[in-house]
Amino acid sequence: MAAVAALQLGLRAAGLGRAPASAAWRSVLRVSPRPGVAWRPSRCGSSAAEASATKAEDDSFLQWVLLLIPVTAFGLGTWQVQRRKWKLNLIAELESRVLAEPVPLPADPMELKNLEYRPVKVRGCFDHSKELYMMPRTMVDPVREAREGGLISSSTQSGAYVVTPFHCTDLGVTILVNRGFVPRKKVNPETRQKGQIEGEVDLIGMVRLTETRQPFVPENNPERNHWHYRDLEAMARITGAEPIFIDANFQSTVPGGPIGGQTRVTLRNEHLQYIVTWYGLSAATSYLWFKKFLRGTPGV
């Protein structure tokens, strides 16, 4: 105790009696502070708290961003349900048109806009001198396609559709009739004279409207008489007919002539696959989101 008292008296004598305890002990222990280094209380605890708060904010933001994936997938699945319903109604409407009883061809061309794929009946005669050729084409064979599981490309034989002006005697107008398919070696009418019908005939065919050129489809070449899609205005100018077009039915086929019934009415309906895909993705990502962010949360 005497030594401690003597030490305190010595410090006071040196003017250090009121110095902070830390400075006094550094003086006693002969520890020199590093230049520029301040002796302050540790902030390790507060820094850890700030980092934890920042991480919590980041996790919360990520949580709601990732929730958009299952929500969006569910919305797309619901949209596909509506699209499938619309497509089924459209298919049913087309089937009812195709199977309907043929009606006389309307005198007003404007009525045809609502009659595509509807059978109509006409009476008149062909003008074989102005044939047009839609090519290349493959033959539509419903019997073979049904036998082979609906394969559209079941026939690989290439050829053309023969489109011939047809003067309707009852209406007094000339229309365009797709008589049907001929193989490439029979495109020249000289090779199928037997099938060039003469005189007045009765026909039943399906109304077809004009087409717009699809991507990757070549342009029509009227100079070479090669038509890749139905441009009714251009075809009408070349032949002098009205822009009215029908596909003759199979019963119009004559020996040595084009094979009629070349109307394929097919609509892709893959919406059920899309429904399963989107709802499945929504369910899977919802489970992962729940497992990542809610599992282990108190009360969940």
From Swiss-Prot:
It is a multi-pass membrane protein. PROSITE patterns: SURF1. It holds the Pfam family SURF1. Changing residue 192 to W: In CMT4K; uncertain significance. GO terms for biological process: aerobic respiration; mitochondrial cytochrome c oxidase assembly; respiratory chain complex IV assembly. GO terms for molecular function: cytochrome-c oxidase activity. The chain crosses the membrane at residues 61-79, 274-290. It is found in: Mitochondrion inner membrane. One of its GO terms (cellular component) is mitochondrial inner membrane. Component of the MITRAC (mitochondrial translation regulation assembly intermediate of cytochrome c oxidase complex) complex, the core components of this complex being COA3/MITRAC12 and COX14. Interacts with COA3. It is linked to Mitochondrial complex IV deficiency, nuclear type 1: An autosomal recessive disorder of the mitochondrial respiratory chain characterized by early-onset, rapidly progressive encephalopathy, neurodegeneration, and loss of motor and cognitive skills. Affected individuals show hypotonia, failure to thrive, loss of the ability to sit or walk, poor communication, poor eye contact, oculomotor abnormalities, as well as deafness, ataxia, tremor, and brisk tendon reflexes. Brain imaging shows bilateral symmetric lesions in the basal ganglia. Charcot-Marie-Tooth disease, demyelinating, type 4K: An autosomal recessive, demyelinating form of Charcot-Marie-Tooth disease, a disorder of the peripheral nervous system, characterized by progressive weakness and atrophy, initially of the peroneal muscles and later of the distal muscles of the arms. Charcot-Marie-Tooth disease is classified in two main groups on the basis of electrophysiologic properties and histopathology: primary peripheral demyelinating neuropathies (designated CMT1 when they are dominantly inherited) and primary peripheral axonal neuropathies (CMT2). Component of the MITRAC (mitochondrial translation regulation assembly intermediate of cytochrome c oxidase complex) complex, that regulates cytochrome c oxidase assembly. Belongs to the SURF1 family. This is Surfeit locus protein 1. It comes from Homo sapiens (Human). The gene is SURF1.
